[in-house]
Amino acid sequence: MTTVTKHKVLLIAGPTAVGKTALSLALAKQLNGEIISGDSMQVYRHLDIGTAKIMPEEQAGIPHHLIDIKNIDQRFTVAEFVSRTTALIIDISARGKLPIIVGGTGFYLQSLLAGYQFGPADNEPDMAYRQAWFDRAAVEGSDVAWMALKQRDPQAATAIAPANLVRVVRALEYVHTTGQLFSEQADTHGDTLDAYTLCLTAERALLYTRINQRVDQMVAAGLEQEARWLFDQGGAMLPAGKGIGYHEWFPYFNGEQTRDESIAKIKQDSRRYAKRQLTWFRNKMSVDWINLLEHPELRASIDQRLASWLS
């Protein structure tokens, strides 16, 4: 029997403005780690302020990956994230270091942990198909998805527990998008990661206050000029132009709203995004929640949890 090597991977997740960067730097130093960005916008060159990108002088000598790897006219798909991150995990682990993935793009993180497979013609997952099964299972129970898999790929159904809805839906989606049996493809990725996910959180009023303050700091640091540059390159027509903190400026640049209205919209969109992030991590992923902003004394408990996981 072939023994599959399990790679330890630490994920630090959570909404924007909750303190992920500071914790990741501290833990990377403590655990001899390297950091992989799990943020879908930090891949873009020249977009530093609006993405809250950690700059080289702030990285404290810790290697950071998946930052500044794309031009603003290039797409960064979940398939590419999974592929690149998997390769980085293997490389970092082989060098005796701990991969630490930091970010708030929940779908990307979930896809990595669940081991979603993306064929060459399937550059993006079928989100509508996947969500339809999650919605149906929420009403009828997870067995309904498993029974469908049993009809389409009995061997896969035998190998997957009915209660493991994420994996069942992954198998159904694979059959749906490729026309091939899930049981016949090498689906080992999800079994090669020994992942531990810390999700930072905070009481909503405090989180929203921090988000508003962060936006003000970004504006003071030159966010408007950064957004103007992006607008002049093509703005909303570019993949990078859809990011929060950027697209809200475009109506102002077109003379359709005021500067203050643009800033208020960035704050509103950022708060709504934080709410969606928390909902995603709560409903779609298995995480350990911790509120360090209001309870810094819990920092010691993180060390205890990690020591147990790493032992």
Swiss-Prot record:
Annotated region Interaction with substrate tRNA: the residues are 39-42
Q: Which UniProt keywords apply?
A: ATP-binding, Magnesium, Nucleotide-binding, Transferase, tRNA processing
GO molecular function terms noted in the UniProt entry: ATP binding; tRNA dimethylallyltransferase activity
Residues annotated for substrate binding in this entry = 16-21
Quick check: keyword Transport in the entry?
A: no
Supply the InterPro entries for this chain.
Answer: Dimethylallyltransferase, IPT, P-loop_NTPase
The cofactor required is: Mg(2+)
Q: What is its EC number?
A: 2.5.1.75
Alphabetically, which GO biological process terms does the record hold?
Answer: tRNA modification
Site feature location: Interaction with substrate tRNA: 105, 130
Q: Which residues take part in binding ATP?
A: 14-21
For this protein, the record's Pfam families field holds: IPPT (PF01715)
Subunit notes for this chain?
Monomer.
**Assigned protein family:** Belongs to the IPP transferase family.
Cite the NCBIfam families for this sequence.
miaA
Purpose? Catalyzes the transfer of a dimethylallyl group onto the adenine at position 37 in tRNAs that read codons beginning with uridine, leading to the formation of N6-(dimethylallyl)adenosine (i(6)A).
In terms of HAMAP family, this protein maps to: IPP_trans (MF_00185)
Q: What is this protein called?
A: tRNA dimethylallyltransferase
The species this protein belongs to is Lactiplantibacillus plantarum (strain ATCC BAA-793 / NCIMB 8826 / WCFS1) (Lactobacillus plantarum)
